[in-house]
Amino acid sequence: MTEPSRHIPVLGQEAVGLLAPRDGGVYVDATFGAGGYSGLILAAADTRVIGIDRDRTAIAGGFDLVERSGGRLTLVEDRFSNLAEVCAAQGAGLVDGVVMDVGVSSMQLDQSERGFSFRLAGPLDMRMGQSGPSAADVIAVASEAELANIIYIFGEERHSRAVARAIVAARAIEPITTTRALADIVGKVVHAKPGEIHPATRTFQGLRIFVNGELDELHLALSAAERVLKPGGRLVVVSFHSLEDRIVKNFFNARGKTGGGSRHLPELDQEAPSFAILTKRPITAGPDELAGNPRARSAKLRAGERTAALAHPGEDLPAWPTLDAVMGRR
């Protein structure tokens, strides 16, 4: 059996405990990252794991685990919203479990050249897949109103209009191309009190989510997981901020109860629940994990078990700002 990855994933034991890997099962680590969840799954049972990540650096970093797995781990460079297509291409059919660790990885945050962190000097990049427009590109061309919407909707920054105004004023003088430059601009209009988060936290979050289309990706990935899980298969999702957790919570709530049907057309069948919810309340990190990994403080884990009911129809994506809409006009 494979030794676990040296990387310790947030809520890793809880996540794998809920997945309950069994010999001969097929599991999808939809956000491979540093391979922590994959390593734990491979160590727990004689399973096959398909690891997906849009970041080619993460895929390259996982080759050692691939070798140690004895052929039980396959890595695929792709978005996790495409997990159904990935499973089909790998001949996996329906799978026994899917785990998702949503958002930016610790590895990405710690690499200054990736431009995710306001604490490290680097280019203002923020692309998980290292292709397409960067955060600097968005900052350069988005209107003041668009920037304010992006920072407010995806960063939940209540000073978004002031931040957007400051960005537009600063870029008129010189391009904003580094993390430090943007953090300094934000710090002049957002003033944190002692003990509060860094003034640039929400602005960086908003830009990162926007650049990578993270919330749309999550919506699509959850629906894809619903389609590829066999009855009894389990979906485990770890999220790190309220926007993500709300999407996951609403997904499980919508699929964990019988559809309302129509009082006007009572003969129509109600939608049967496609998931049995395993976590009535989200699981959070305990004091021991928090002592060793402060980044776990905002993590919430939710899980569900697939029933034999048909997958629910996919909902329309929310009408929030998109990268194509902002960049496509330029």
From Swiss-Prot:
Molecular function via GO: rRNA (cytosine-N4-)-methyltransferase activity
Signal peptide positions on this chain: none
EC primary class: transferase
GO BP: rRNA base methylation
Its biological purpose: Specifically methylates the N4 position of cytidine in position 1402 (C1402) of 16S rRNA.
Family: Belongs to the methyltransferase superfamily. RsmH family.
Descriptive protein name: Ribosomal RNA small subunit methyltransferase H
